[in-house]
Every structure is written in C-alpha cells, then in structure tokens.
Amino acid sequence: MNYQQLECDYFNLYNQFISVDFQISLFEKNHKSLIKDFIFFYHQILKQKDLNFLLGVRNKIALKVHNYMQEYSTSPKDLSLICLREHKHIEFFQRFYKALAYFVAFRKKLDEEQKIKNLISNINDCFGCHFINSDFNNLQNFQKNDFFTLPEKCLQYFHLAMIHLCFMVLNPLNFKDYNRHLDKAINYLIDGAFEIYELIFKEYFLLFPKDEELKD
C-alpha cells in the first residue's frame, strides 16, 4: 500500500465509522476518542511519515472501528478503495493542523496555575480531547495525554468536514453534489481553525489582561 492508497483507505475507514455515527451522540466517550485518532492519523498521512509506521497506526484504528461497530451491532460496509478526484481540501486541513500546532505550543508554555485558571474559565468547553505537541509523533502518548484539551466544537468541525468528504468519496460521479460537499467541508475546516485561534486569544487575554489593549 502506497501513500495514495493509504489516504483512500483512510476515507473508507471513516465511512465505516460514520455508519455508526448517526446512532449515537458526539458526546459518547469512545466516539470522541476515535475522532481524535483520525485527526492524528490524517496529520501523519499528510506529513508522509514512515509508511510502516502509518500502516501500524492504520491497523490500530481499523481494529478500534471494527470493535466500535460490533458494540453498536453495525455490519461493516463493503467499500472499494475509492479516492477523491482532487486535493483542494488538503490546504485547509493543513491550516487546521497549523492552528492546532499554535494552540498546543501556547498551552505548553503555561504553568499549572495558569492551566487551572483556563480550565475554570472554559469549563463549559473542556470536554474535548487531548493533544501533546505539534508533532503528534506518538499515538500512545497522544491518547493518554490530558494537558491539552481541544474544544468540543473543533472535534465537531473536523467530523462534519469528514462526513462531507466521505460523501464525495462514495458519490464521485455526482458532480453537482461533489462540489457542494467540498465547499461545505472546506468551510467546516476554516471554522475549526478559527475556533482554535479564538480560544488562544481568549485564554491569553484571560491570563494577561494588561495586554488586552493589543486587540484594538
């Protein structure tokens, strides 16, 4: 399997995941954990990490998806290895990951007292997933880390973008809907990146209110 085939397989795996999606809530713990794994995995694919490493990550996620489908008594779909016709979406995924990298870099510079202050301030938004650093090099640490909480909306925006991209994969000849879903996916990725930057500014000015005049 090469990088292009791996990306095709990624979307097919996400299609399997989506088949369970409409049965449950996004707030279900395992659901969020899988979205986080998919975020991690696609970032690694775009960076073209070592292919053997990527296949190992792929197999772990595929097993999780299989177990997840069994948990909700959903049969796997018989999907062929279909790819998107073009790659306009990649630029906007890269913007999303760049925003996430800034977010993680910002959080890493905070001490424990500052983290707690932000946690209290953002208590209604702090039910997301956790990230370790801008490289995301270790899936095990990526899953276990509980320092960097991604806002719930960012998970939702990523997931909604993937739903539209998966529709394009399953309906490659429907040109009218293809472009419409591509535009929606891009808009969700832009919204997700904006949400991350907005949180950075919110937390920064909470911790350093004297600098708030910089916003004007």
What are these regions (language model features)?
Residues 158, 165, 182, 189, ...:
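Inward-facing hydrophobic residues that define packing positions of alpha-helical scaffold repeats
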Residues 88, 190, 215-216:
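Membrane-proximal, non-transmembrane alpha-helical segments
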Residues 66-83, 177-191, 195:
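Charged, amphipathic alpha-helical scaffolding segments
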Residues 54-58, 77, 204, 208-216:
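Polybasic, proline/glycine-rich intrinsically disordered low-complexity segments
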Residues 40, 163, 167-170, 187, ...:
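Extended, non-membrane alpha-helical segments enriched in charged/polar residues
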Residues 104-107, 111, 169, 193-208:
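Long, hydrophobic, amphipathic alpha-helical segments used as structural scaffolds
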Residues 166-180:
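Short, charged/polar, low-complexity loop and linker segments
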Residues 1-168:
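N-terminal pre-first-transmembrane soluble regions of secretory-pathway and organelle membrane proteins
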